[in-house]
UniProtKB/Swiss-Prot annotation:
GO terms for cellular component: cytoplasm; proteasome core complex, alpha-subunit complex. PROSITE patterns: PROTEASOME_ALPHA_2. The formation of the proteasomal ATPase ARC-20S proteasome complex, likely via the docking of the C-termini of ARC into the intersubunit pockets in the alpha-rings, may trigger opening of the gate for substrate entry. Interconversion between the open-gate and close-gate conformations leads to a dynamic regulation of the 20S proteasome proteolysis activity. InterPro entries: Ntn_hydrolases_N (IPR029055), Proteasome_alpha-type (IPR023332), Proteasome_asu_bac (IPR022296), Proteasome_sua/b (IPR001353). It comes from Renibacterium salmoninarum (strain ATCC 33209 / DSM 20767 / JCM 11484 / NBRC 15589 / NCIMB 2235). Belongs to the peptidase T1A family. The 20S proteasome core is composed of 14 alpha and 14 beta subunits that assemble into four stacked heptameric rings, resulting in a barrel-shaped structure. The two inner rings, each composed of seven catalytic beta subunits, are sandwiched by two outer rings, each composed of seven alpha subunits. The catalytic chamber with the active sites is on the inside of the barrel. Has a gated structure, the ends of the cylinder being occluded by the N-termini of the alpha-subunits. Is capped by the proteasome-associated ATPase, ARC. The lineage of its organism: Bacteria, Bacillati, Actinomycetota, Actinomycetes, Micrococcales. One of its GO terms (biological process) is modification-dependent protein catabolic process. This is Proteasome subunit alpha. Pathway: Protein degradation; proteasomal Pup-dependent pathway.
Length: 242
């Protein structure tokens, strides 16, 4: 007769958490940061087609680190949720907080009930009329959710990236300031330290005044290589905001 080994629930949860953390730590980092002109989403990502940053709804964007197939399925589910809710009720009823709550429930259910947890970490951002009304939510593999102020750093070298951004970010910083700061932080988080350029970056912006500047309600705008270089060239990446 085969002897069955007992594993405590605490040990099971610890093993799941360790497994997910190791998977996330292998991924390149992402920074989401608020600026005067909007919210910048900056990722180290050399792939031109496998995006880590995406649009969810009018003023809401998504960023992720970890396993691509897992966070891409969550992104698509978020788009469907937002479309259905906006169509069924009102477009103003689609909020980052509501989307983050749905993601938290899904991640928590997978973490506790499925064979393996998702190896992902998510950020949901919603741009407001001013910086005080910006909403940034960070979601971890177990469904935990945090309402962050100013910026979010995620991924493999999160401690060093977070330290650089925290030291340089200030409310009222320009878009060029925060993009340069985020890019510098991503490079500083690498071993050895590297200087990232447009070929290794994926950057998008949630424009605060998209209806005025571009005549559209959709705030999300993905930057091309020329736009990235224009943002980085005046300051040089990694300069702290003044």
């Amino acid at each position: 007769m085969t002897q069955q080994f007992y594993v405590s629930p605490e040990q099971v949860m610890k093993d799941r958490a360790d497994f997910a953390r190791k998977g996330i730590a292998r991924g390149r980092s992402v920074v989401v940061v608020s600026s005067l002109e909007g919210i910048a989403l900056v990722a180290e990502n050399p792939s031109p087609s496998l995006h880590k940053i995406g649009e969810i709804y009018d003023k809401i964007a998504f960023a992720a680190v970890g396993k691509y197939n897992e966070f891409e399925s969550l992104r698509q589910a978020g788009v469907r949720y937002a479309d259905v809710r906006g169509y069924s009720y009102d477009r103003d009823d689609v909020t980052a907080r509501g989307l983050a709550s749905v993601y938290a429930q899904s991640l928590g259910a997978v973490f506790t009930a499925e064979q393996k947890p998702f190896e992902v970490e998510l950020a949901v951002a919603e741009v407001g009329e001013n910086q005080d009304q910006d909403h940034l939510y960070r979601l971890t593999f177990d469904g935990s959710i945090a309402d962050e102020t100013g910026f979010i750093a995620m991924g493999g070298q999160v401690d060093s990236v977070h330290q650089v951004v925290a030291a340089g970010w200030a409310s009222g910083s320009s878009l060029a300031d925060v993009v340069g700061l985020a890019v510098g932080a991503l490079g500083a988080g690498r071993e050895p330290v590297v200087e990232l350029d447009a070929a290794n970056l994926e950057i998008a912006v949630l424009d605060r005044d998209s209806e005025t500047s571009r005549g559209v309600a959709r705030a999300f705008r993905r930057l091309n290589a020329n736009e990235v270089n224009d943002l980085l060239s005046p300051r040089g990446s990694g300069s702290p905001a003044e």
